[in-house]
């Protein structure tokens, strides 16, 4: 394990690229290969830039969501329960999309010196939180998910992929139907716990019980949350309203420091025992993306990945005997500069 870490919220990046216009995910013939190229290219360019000053003392990690459920759903059944219905009503072939995401992650694990981490019962959030705790140096998180704001400090930085900037306070954001400005991560987290994450993870606000089945949830938005934060005794106020239990429920679901010890131990073990590969040539040959097979770009990829991860050696840097180029990729010879749109 190196001193520093660059960690990607892999699902977050994949979903953003899936919905780009160039991929045409809702069409009858989506550009799956183009999508995978864009995912990898975004990661590579970020690794190259973010790792430039780390002197090779850096691990690059992909944090994946578990394919076997989440511990949060075990304690709160509504957790993300509305996503399946949303996907079933979409024109996107999500089964195929997830297959393509998994294939890319598998190819990276097989060929590159990047750690691909998936832990049964855990989400990318749990993995990234653990990374922020076990790596002693600089940790750089790549995600547009605002949940990671609670981890930001002098050592942990968040690159917001949706606007291409490093996160900093004050932070203007939406919570429920309202908008506010957070001046600290503590304030941001408390508001999130109280108002819930109904549009994101289906976490109800603190006035809504877990077994709620009505047509309209009780309201509790930003104004109510900020007013409660000004209270001299927040716990007493919550108990008086009969919602302290729901507050603790939401804190368990949203506050990353609430990760169960056994899950933290599982992730830590995965981080320590994860094997990486040393075959960038093999990765490039596997996909044969034209813009990365050209001499200058190919050299940049080979030496860039080696430099950031502190690697060198013939298996990484020697040119292969034969270069191949897929004919079906001729139409993508000039990808241009794609951007991840908000």
Write out the residue ranges for each language-model feature.
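Domain-level signal for Mg2+-assisted phosphodiester chemistry and nucleotide/NA-binding surfaces
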Residues: 1-106
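Extended two-metal-dependent nuclease catalytic cores across DNA- and RNA-processing enzymes
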Residues: 3, 57, 85-296, 302, ...
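Acidic, proline-/serine-/threonine-rich low-complexity intrinsically disordered repeat tracts
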Residues: 322-324
């Amino acid at each position: 394990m190196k001193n520093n870490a660059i960690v990607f919220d892999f699902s977050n990046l994949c979903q953003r690229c899936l919905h780009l216009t160039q991929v045409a995910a809702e069409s009858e013939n989506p550009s799956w290969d183009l999508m995978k190229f864009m995912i990898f290219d975004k990661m590579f360019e970020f690794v190259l830039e973010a790792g430039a000053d780390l002197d090779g003392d850096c691990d690059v990690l992909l944090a994946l969501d578990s394919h076997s459920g989440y511990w949060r759903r075990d304690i709160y059944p509504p957790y993300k329960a509305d996503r399946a219905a949303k996907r079933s009503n979409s024109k996107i072939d999500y089964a195929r999309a997830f297959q393509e995401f998994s294939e890319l992650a598998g190819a990276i694990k097989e060929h590159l010196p990047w750690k691909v981490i998936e832990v049964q019962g855990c989400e990318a959030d749990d993995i990234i939180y653990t990374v922020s705790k076990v790596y002693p140096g600089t940790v750089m998180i790549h995600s547009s998910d605002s949940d990671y704001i609670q981890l930001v400090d002098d050592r942990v930085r968040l690159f917001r992929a949706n606007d291409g900037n490093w996160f900093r306070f004050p932070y203007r954001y939406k919570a429920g139907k309202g908008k506010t400005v957070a001046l600290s991560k503590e304030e941001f987290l408390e508001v999130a716990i109280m108002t819930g994450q109904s549009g994101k993870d289906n976490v109800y606000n603190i006035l809504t019980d877990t077994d709620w089945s009505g047509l309209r949830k009780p309201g509790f938005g930003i104004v109510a949350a900020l007013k409660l934060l000004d209270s001299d005794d927040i716990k007493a106020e919550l108990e008086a309203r009969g919602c302290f239990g729901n507050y603790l429920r939401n804190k368990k679901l949203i506050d990353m420091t609430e990760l169960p010890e056994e899950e933290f131990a599982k992730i830590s073990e995965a981080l320590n025992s994860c094997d990486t590969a040393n075959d960038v040539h093999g990765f490039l040959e596997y996909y044969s993306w034209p813009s990365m097979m050209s001499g200058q770009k190919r050299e940049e990829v080979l030496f860039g990945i080696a430099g950031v991860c502190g690697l060198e050696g013939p298996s990484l840097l020697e040119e292969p005997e034969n270069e191949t180029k897929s004919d079906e990729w001729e139409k993508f010879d000039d990808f241009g500069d794609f951007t991840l749109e908000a």
